[in-house]
């Protein structure tokens, strides 16, 4: 019984303890579950917050990438627009160039039509001349027939006389007639021999010229009257013109060159018939563009500097040509004069290159004939030296060249060659004849010369010479293709009233002495400067 009670007591105690343990575990499990729930809720909040932050970051990243993409698209669009604009400008330039070429072709075609018209006129004159010649020949034949009939009558009369003559008298008449016939035959044979000798001489001369021309490889580029200067950008045009045009007027008055500024992009055109003045203007303008300081004082400084530089270049041209032709021991003054011919043209042909070509041809001809080759080359090289100064000294270029060759003690053969190459005096040597032939070859070959260009340049040169012929004139420049003559006078010699009178006199002399199209503007400039230095 006691055992049962103890068992029950222990069982109850165990139940109580088990309940207590289970209750404690359940409580702990509940707390753990609540803590887990709280942690889960916190994690959910954190996850939501992180998701919102990630979403915001993704949104900002997308916006940034979108802006970058838009910017890249904008840059690409601008680049495409720039390329398209460049292509359009290139096509525009090409079309404009084609239009210029087309205009040049039309001008050339018009000139060709004019030439054809002149040829037709000359052919018509030739036909008229031939018709007149045929008429003259017909009349001459009629006259000859009349003479033959008269001779027949005369012979018949003579035969009648002979019939009544003695044997000795008849023999004398026959011998006299025979002598006349023989004299006629001898004269015909002499003429035939002379013609054969002339034909043979002409053939030999042509063979010599052909061999000399085949051995000479010359080239030539026609001279022009304009020079193009390229600009870094179009804004430079305004700086070249200057305020109220002071810069461009100063440059034109100092160089005597017409400066043309038009709508052509990044280009300025220098126009003038004097190549030396045009080259000085080009050098000055390029130096001004490179330097950046463009004002009248700087322009005057650079023009003077480039004049000195041009003197050095002229001497270098002369030395190079003398070396090319093989003419040693030339006087320095003669070398400088020959260098000036680089900037002189004759009917569009560069005179220095023409002189070198004549020297080479004369040397080749001399070698074929066994003459002094070096002397022939030297004489041919110097034959046109008078053209270097014929604008400044009175007389033809032949007279001036002869005088300078004599002054610098050139060989008498060279002096005679210069004097005789245009037939003014008699040639005294074979070399003089060879140089004259070489000069004719170099001048007359197709494409060497352009007569219309030479006539244009001569008209401008005559215009300047008329202006400088008056007392007190310092310089004169023909501008605007001869439509304006600008005259610089010495202020100490001429007053303001004298300037007006001078312009009137120049106008009258131009009207009396020159033939020209349109009008010519005469501008006389009198500039007085007073310079002092503060110390």
UniProtKB/Swiss-Prot annotation:
Chain residue ranges for the region called Disordered: 110-141
Membrane topology type: Single-pass membrane protein
Gene3D superfamilies, per database record: Hypothetical protein af1432, K Homology domain, type 1
Transmembrane portions of the chain: 4-24
Record keywords: Cell membrane, Endonuclease, Hydrolase, Membrane, Nuclease, RNA-binding, Transmembrane, Transmembrane helix
Molecular function in Gene Ontology: RNA binding; RNA endonuclease activity
Disulphide bonds in the chain: none
Chief place where the protein resides: membrane
Domain of life: Bacteria
Name of the top EC class for this enzyme: hydrolase
Domain KH: 225-285
UniProt keyword annotation of Metal-binding present: no
EC number in record: 3.1.-.-
UniProt function note: Endoribonuclease that initiates mRNA decay.
Protein name: Ribonuclease Y
């Amino acid at each position: 019984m006691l055992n049962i009670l103890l068992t029950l007591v222990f069982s109850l105690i165990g139940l109580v303890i088990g309940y207590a343990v289970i209750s404690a575990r359940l409580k702990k499990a509940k707390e753990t579950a609540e803590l887990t729930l709280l942690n889960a809720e916190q994690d959910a909040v954190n996850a939501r917050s992180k998701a919102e932050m990630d979403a915001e970051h993704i949104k900002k990243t997308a916006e940034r990438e979108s802006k970058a993409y838009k910017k890249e698209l904008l840059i690409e669009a601008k680049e495409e627009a720039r390329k398209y604009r460049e292509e359009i400008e290139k096509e525009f330039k090409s079309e404009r160039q084609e239009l210029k070429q087309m205009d040049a072709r039309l001008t050339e075609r018009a000139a060709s039509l004019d030439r054809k018209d002149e040829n037709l006129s000359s052919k018509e004159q030739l036909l008229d001349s031939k018709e007149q010649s045929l008429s003259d020949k017909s009349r001459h034949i009629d006259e000859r027939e009349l003479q033959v009939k008269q001779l027949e009558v005369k012979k018949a009369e003579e035969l009648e006389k002979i019939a009544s003559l003695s044997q000795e008298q008849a023999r004398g008449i026959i011998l006299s007639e025979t002598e006349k016939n023989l004299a006629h035959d001898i004269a015909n044979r002499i003429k035939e021999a002379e013609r054969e000798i002339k034909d043979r001489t002409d053939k030999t001369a042509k063979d010599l010229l052909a061999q000399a021309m085949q051995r000479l490889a010359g080239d030539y580029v026609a001279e022009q009257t304009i020079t193009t200067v390229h600009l870094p950008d179009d804004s430079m045009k305004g700086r070249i013109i200057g305020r109220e045009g002071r810069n461009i007027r100063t440059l034109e008055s100092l160089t005597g060159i017409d400066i043309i500024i038009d709508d052509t992009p990044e280009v300025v055109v220098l126009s003038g018939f004097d190549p030396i003045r045009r080259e000085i203007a080009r050098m000055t303008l390029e130096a001004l563009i490179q330097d950046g300081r463009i004002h009248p004082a700087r322009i005057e400084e650079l023009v003077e500097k480039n004049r000195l530089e041009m003197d050095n270049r002229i001497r270098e041209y002369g030395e190079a040509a003398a070396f090319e032709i093989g003419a040693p021991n030339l006087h320095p003054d003669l070398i400088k004069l020959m260098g000036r011919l680089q900037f002189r043209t004759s009917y569009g042909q560069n005179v220095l290159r023409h002189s070198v070509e004549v020297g080479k041809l004369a040397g080749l001809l001399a070698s074929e004939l066994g003459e002094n080759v070096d002397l022939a080359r030297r004489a041919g090289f110097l034959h046109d030296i008078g053209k270097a100064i014929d604008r400044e000294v009175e007389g033809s270029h032949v007279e001036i060249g002869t005088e300078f060759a004599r002054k610098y003690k050139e060989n008498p053969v060279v002096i005679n060659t210069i004097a005789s190459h245009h037939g003014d005096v008699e040639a005294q040597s074979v070399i003089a004849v060879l140089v004259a032939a070489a000069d004719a070859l170099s001048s007359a070959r197709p494409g060497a010369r352009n007569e219309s260009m030479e006539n244009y340049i001569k008209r401008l040169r005559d215009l300047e010479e008329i202006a400088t012929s008056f007392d007190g004139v310092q310089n004169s420049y023909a501008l605007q293709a001869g439509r304006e003559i600008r005259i610089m006078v010495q202020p100490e010699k001429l007053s303001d009233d004298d300037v007006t009178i001078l312009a009137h006199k120049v106008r009258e002399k131009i009207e009396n002495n020159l033939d020209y199209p349109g009008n010519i503007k005469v501008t006389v400039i009198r500039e007085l400067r007073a310079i002092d230095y503060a110390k």
